[in-house]
Amino acid sequence: MGPNCGVDDPNAVIKGIELANTLGMDAISIGVVVGFAMECYEKGLITKEQTGGLELNFGNGSAMNALIKKIALREDIGDVLAEGCKIAAEKIGGGSEKFANHIKGLEMTGYEIRGLKTAALGYAVSRRGGDHQRHGSYSHDLKGTVDRYKAEPGRGALVMNDEDLYCILDSFIICKFTRGVWQGPYEELAEVYSLVTGIPMTADQMKKTGERISNLARLLNIREGLTRADDTLPYRAMHEPIPAGVSKGSYVTQAELDLMLDAYYEARGWDNQGVPGLAKLEELGLLDYASIVEGGAA
């Protein structure tokens, strides 16, 4: 809520988070939506009359929190914004789609992906959209284990491995802040699983389970009509370079994204449209879902 809305008053930001929690809304999404509304207001796409008298300028903490309430109660422009920035942009129009910061309809979390190429791929292929909890691939960029400004084929395998591990951590209901303490990590996770359930489990079996979950999620998205075209990034991330700072000039080109998508699909054993083939489904015990991908990869 702070940077997205230009609000530097910590009390206003804390109040906004409290409101979101109390009113049953995600604080990340609501911060992006309010920031989107502020940009619409400053560009003349939303009027003061539509806001119910609120002056939605960037930096206006009181207006930010008042709008959060309106969104929860679907009052004035809040009725449109309550649908999220993707649908709101479709309704507001006027080019607002270009600054609606979402992936697959889910508002982006707080990472500047224009200067984090591994993270950019992780977000693009995320089954939920703009959710850092599906991959955590920004860690490679931030730790300097890769050149964060460079798109390379090897990023595909990195993101795949992160996703599969996160599937296991979610299945264990383990906080991902502990992801670095598990030895192996699958060796220790498999040992814990066996000790708790009494069911023998090897590290390889545990790893394969994570892969199975990732592939099943992909199948469900394909069933719902998602394609390679949905594995993309917000317009701003791909067309507007970072204006200042150490990452000045960075953004993700379509060619860079395509290179990393191809590498990711290849690492997954999918075809170039991101569709798992029958051989992969058989390997993972998912042939019951073969009808979803008929005509896809072999």
Segments (PLM) and residue ranges:
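Extended C-terminal regions of large enzymes
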Residues: 1-298
